[in-house]
Amino acid sequence: MRKKIEIYDTTLRDGNQGEGVNLSLADKLDITAALDDMGVDFIEGGWPGSNPKDIEYFQAVKDVELRTARISAFGSTHRANIDPADDFFLTKLVEAGADVTCIFGKAWDLHVDEALRVTGDTNLDMIAEIGRAHV
């Protein structure tokens, strides 16, 4: 039985965070086309709502004809004490209209305690609520 390996590329988001790296919208669209030409399955375009360039990218990439790649939007769980349906960043993920959405949730106790300032159970509830509100 043959298994297919699918490639999920994060160059446009994670790669853009490198020191001295500042991809323009045109750069991101050119890289998208090149990754698609190479047969990459998923291209993570950025974090809609985190900056104007990523919002522009998700609008502009809709006009790019891709052969195989599916565009993914990246984001996090909603903020504590905010209904997921009312969370700005989750709303921007939905509005981006990407083929795929990649949502991360904090897993390390230190991050849950110090960054989110919620209990572990509350954090798990926040992660579960995303599916109920937006999937």
Residue ranges and their predicted role:
Residues 2-5, 39-41, 66-71, 97-99:
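Short, well-ordered coil/turn segments that N-cap beta-strands
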Residues 8-27, 73-84, 112-124:
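Active-site mouth loops of central-metabolism enzymes
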Residues 8-9, 98-107, 127:
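Non-cysteine beta-strand/loop elements that form the S-adenosyl-L-methionine
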Residues 23-34, 85-92:
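Short, acidic/polar
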Residues 133-135:
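Conserved small/polar residues in nucleotide/adenosyl-binding loops
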